């Protein structure tokens, strides 16, 4: 689902998918479908296309009953059949709690009780039959038009409001976000042994902060992105950086190398 894509790039994707014995379909919604929305935050790196996430029930054919949505800053490292087979009876989506779920401001701004928590919309197993029956797309449009001042994190806020009573949470391994690898963030984890196992062996890895293609990314599993990139037609491509940026990167790393500053990320070998 995209506003547009060149025929050349469509063919590259068709060939890649066909090499694994599958096919791919492209959906290009009308330009005015998202006219009622606006980008509220991260406008320099997020386009209006993010709101397609709210409109899948209007975009996709009626015979599509379920969708696994994944952000583009994600690598799938293992079998997702367990996640795909999650029971979605009576709910709109299966999702994973956001690393920022404990920020009271979110619930005050969005006007729902924090006991329902807040999910990260980068990984969503969507029950499209439920969305059509409950007109989730229209609910998103109506909420944005009525309360635009409440929306900060774009479509993620909208979906959390509309689905706050109608979702099911699944384990972190299905959306292991950047913040869970960082020091200095209260993760409020009940079972640290289980949490550590999920950190070491995530199934869906989500680079929610610095992207692995950013030259200054410090993510401990950054290499996983390039491992899978090198299995595509874009094999060998790496971020380009000027001499100035490379020097800045070295200077940025020095305090961590000489342990003048505590590392940002956990050492997964500890």
Sequence positions of predicted segments:
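Conserved glycosyltransferase catalytic-site signature
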Residues: 50-54, 121, 152-157
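Short internal beta-strands
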Residues: 1-4, 95-96
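Short, charged/polar "capping" segments at the starts of alpha-helices
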Residues: 4-11, 103
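A glycosyltransferase accessory/donor-loop signature
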Residues: 126-270
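Conserved catalytic core of nucleotide-sugar-dependent glycosyltransferases
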Residues: 85-143, 156
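Active-site-proximal specificity loops/subdomain of glycosyltransferases
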Residues: 8-58
């Amino acid at each position: 689902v995209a506003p547009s894509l060149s025929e050349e790039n469509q063919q590259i994707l068709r060939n890649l998918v066909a090499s694994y014995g599958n096919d791919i379909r492209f959906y290009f919604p009308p330009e005015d479908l998202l006219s009622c929305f606006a980008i509220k935050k991260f406008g320099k790196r997020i386009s209006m296309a993010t709101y397609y996430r709210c409109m899948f029930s209007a975009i996709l054919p009626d015979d599509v009953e379920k969708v696994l949505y994944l952000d583009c800053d994600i690598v799938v490292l293992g079998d997702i059949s367990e996640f795909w087979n999650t029971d979605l009876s009576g709910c709109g989506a299966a999702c994973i709690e956001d690393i920022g779920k404990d920020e009271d401001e979110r619930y005050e701004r969005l006007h729902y009780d924090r006991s329902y928590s807040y999910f990260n919309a980068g990984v969503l197993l969507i029950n499209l039959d439920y969305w059509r029956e409950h007109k989730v797309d229209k609910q998103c449009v109506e909420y944005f038009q009525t309360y635009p001042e409440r929306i900060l994190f774009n479509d993620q806020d909208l979906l959390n409001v509309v689905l706050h009573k109608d979702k099911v949470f699944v384990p972190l391994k299905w959306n292991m976000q950047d913040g869970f690898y960082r020091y200095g963030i209260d993760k409020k984890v009940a079972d640290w042994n289980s949490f550590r196992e999920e950190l070491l062996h995530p199934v869906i890895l989500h680079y929610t902060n610095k992207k692995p293609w950013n030259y200054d990314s410090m993510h401990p599993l950054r290499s996983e992105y390039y491992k899978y990139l090198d299995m595509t037609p874009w094999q060998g491509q790496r971020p380009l950086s000027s001499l100035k940026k490379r020097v800045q990167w070295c200077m940025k790393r020095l305090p961590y190398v000489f342990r003048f500053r505590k590392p940002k990320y956990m050492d997964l070998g500890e």
